[in-house]
């Protein structure tokens, strides 16, 4: 399974990298070394380090593609063979598996290059192994901890690693003549580190030394034998000085790392490890060497800089014969060496502790198990009397880059594990990026990432930043600029896993789980350790953590005193403080609040990052918002003072543009340092708010000549002029909103979401109210919904409804019968066509007929109401009165002569308009033929409205149905009187006629009123002609018995009812449809009697009553269920109590029985003891009687013997008594 990075890290020419030069193989002939120092080491093929020449290690090593090792012939050597390129060939382990020819004395540290040197004359009898002898290193952790390391690492090997403890003074004294020949010298001022199977010591490279290839080996050997005792004796005296030197040196390179950087170039760390299984190519030491080689590929190809560089490596073995060493001297030497050992660095696998869940490792060797067994037997057969060591024991030496600031663990202890936000960002980003690029290239997994395995080094003298660049598909770059105090180096790869270009996997065989590629394991373990680190909350912390590339920083007015000074000083300090620092306010409380408001969001982002580190792969974490501030390029970041890293290995020409702050009073506006030279430019915009910045940019015109005073530290001039105060005030408001949206707490976000949801709910409720769900009707539609409760619907319609249909106005209420805006236009066209036809017919009519015919309604209203204010006139409507009946309705303004044929034996009164249903049947709608008339009466002004019952006339004389004004005035002449007489006759005839309605109750009725007009007076606003009708749900009754029942109702009740309606309509004059409950207006309920439920002339509400009954039954059932449940619970509780009581009684009874039984047994035991005592007494008596030759108790003796048991009988049988007894 390979990890493909699709978002942030793009696969480029990752394998097309230049070859990495290294040391070549040279024969072992004529090699020389210094006798006392460990300065001359050799490679795996026995090449001397003296022949390497000068090693050019510079700060530019991160940006260069090659390192040149100038040696014999000035040839460039390859670190990895050409066979190991991506050609499908496997890795060549032949150099690793070879037995080394280089030998050294473990007791004195002398190196020898000749296996033929026979030192048989040396007496080795004086050297004895002391069981209590300490090694030259100590275990950092307890011995009981389980280590997943290679086998034989824990074996006690009788090797004194005094090569690490040679005193620097003795080296100078004994090698004063040959100091120039030493290429490397041990730096004894620096503490050595050690672990389970090896140690780490530090050497210095003498660049000014001359290469002398000829050394006197004989003199060296003699000096080694003669000065061994001096070496061991002087260690006691000089160790105390070394401790003090280390303390001073340690503080100097941690705190003054930049000053000592030149010295660090010539300092290297040599990691010496015991090769437990020399013929196993997957041994721990070999694995680490292979992994370091391939990680160097990333370093040399400019893809990473967060791994320690492997300078060289070599193998060595101790000599077969050891020199003479006294026991006391060896003990002193070992004791002195232990004082110089501290926590492990570069090799924390010596102290690695793993969980018990890991599996044990199983070693599979290429050459069999014979060599493995031989190494085991050799290490175990070393006795106190023998000092000979077989050549199978080997040591691997890795020359690594030196980290002058120690481990992250040491750095954290010195600082009490308190880091600033900028330090945390640089630390986490470097760790995450190094894992991301190594996973991309080699599927690398560390498997042991903790604070002890993270090294810290200072920046080189001429470097200040690390610029990481990732090229996207569109040609642009993602840039991250990391600065600060240190560079992170991940070390110790003894337990790591890597996939080679030849698809061969290098992993720990004792842990099968490590063979699988797990991208989250390293960060998962590392994130759990981050909880130890605390974030400093200092007022001088930089504000770049919350800025973006195009963000504008604006300070408050209260911080004017410190804005210029703080920002100018911070811009030249570092990348984390490139922007303005936090202002110092006068009040400490305000300052603390401001700091918390800016730091808390970063802390929240940090906690989110820690959570996501446990789930997401490293390459996705690079785009986390916690690292957004790293995308801002500081002003002092240049290609010369930065280490450039690219994900594809090709350093681009493009470099991120820095930002230069411009100051204008209390405000800071960040703009590019090299803007386009134009006369008019736009105001800097933010990525989030585009609309606001566009408005501002239109109003701003910046002159070409700058009129702005730059701070003294800034050398870049800007052609921008400061904006006006109004523009800045506008921009401040916008920026505050933006900052609030950027740094929102989780609680605030939840509150805003809740507020938004509430607003949405309110909008939905408003829409529902408009659509009619709450009882109101929208302006474009009139929807009458039938409800099961006995509501009274009051319909209002405006004066526009009396004439042609028109869309609703804002002042008037909703139109009765209006369906939608589209239907309005259709109805208007139909009415206009019908009006044209009517006009042609009216011109042909006679004058007599013209008197009886009403003019158009608007003209009629003006004529009858405004001109005749004192007269009462009855006007009928020409419009649709929409009812909740499902059947469609037709309106007839002037009924033609053909309509009476459709309605036989019935004519329509002259004063009533006609509403006729369609005769065409429809699906789901009953076929009905009904005629309903609705007269409306207007008194004095249009806001006085009266209702009368619609009646049908059976006058067959009226051949044509004509709509007339019905006048009750005395001024009217004979025509009006005749009409009144006709109406009286019609009333008598209509008593027998029934108004049939829909059986389902979808019908309307009009409340009867007396002839007195004052009974039904309802007041409305002026200029609003509105009428209302009262309708009921469910079954509705006709007229037969309705009149008789309503006669029983007194006028007082009617007056109360209509007064209540009048008050309601005054409160809600423009409401389209309002629902009035009978409970709210009890007087209205008396108008609709409920005595006769099944009769045709009463209001029957069977459905409601059924529902009420069902609801009551449900409630009763629920109550019964609850009661039953309560009873069951009580019964259960009683049963439980009874059971507990029974158990208690049984326990008590058992205890009593046990006591009684014990008493009974004790009584039996006492009785038996008493019987035995009696027997003993009797036996004594028998013995006495025997002496006296008498036996008076023979019978009793036999009887007691039977009771005692068979034991006495057996004795008696075996030894019978005398006859005398």
UniProtKB/Swiss-Prot annotation:
It catalyses: L-seryl-[protein] + ATP = O-phospho-L-seryl-[protein] + ADP + H(+); L-threonyl-[protein] + ATP = O-phospho-L-threonyl-[protein] + ADP + H(+). GO terms for cellular component: cytoplasm; nucleus. Residues 24-37, 112-127, 173-192, 204-263, 324-344, 538-550, 559-584, 725-738, 959-993 have a biased composition (Low complexity). It is an enzyme of class 2 (transferase). Its EC number is 2.7.11.1. Residues 1-37, 104-133, 173-263, 324-346, 538-604, 712-782, 823-858, 959-1008, 1105-1152 are annotated as: Disordered. It holds the Pfam family PK_Tyr_Ser-Thr. Residues 186-627 form the Protein kinase domain. The active site is at residue 448. InterPro entries: Kinase-like_dom_sf (IPR011009), Prot_kinase_dom (IPR000719), Ser-Thr/Tyr_kinase_cat_dom (IPR001245). ATP binds at residues 192-200, 271. GO terms for biological process: intracellular signal transduction; mitotic cell cycle. GO terms for molecular function: ATP binding; histone H3T3 kinase activity; protein serine kinase activity. Residues 746-756 have a biased composition (Acidic residues). Keywords: ATP-binding, Kinase, Nucleotide-binding, Serine/threonine-protein kinase, Transferase. Residues 591-604, 757-769, 823-850 have a biased composition (Basic and acidic residues). SMART domains: S_TKc (SM00220). Belongs to the protein kinase superfamily. Ser/Thr protein kinase family. This is Probable serine/threonine-protein kinase DDB_G0286465. It comes from Dictyostelium discoideum (Social amoeba).
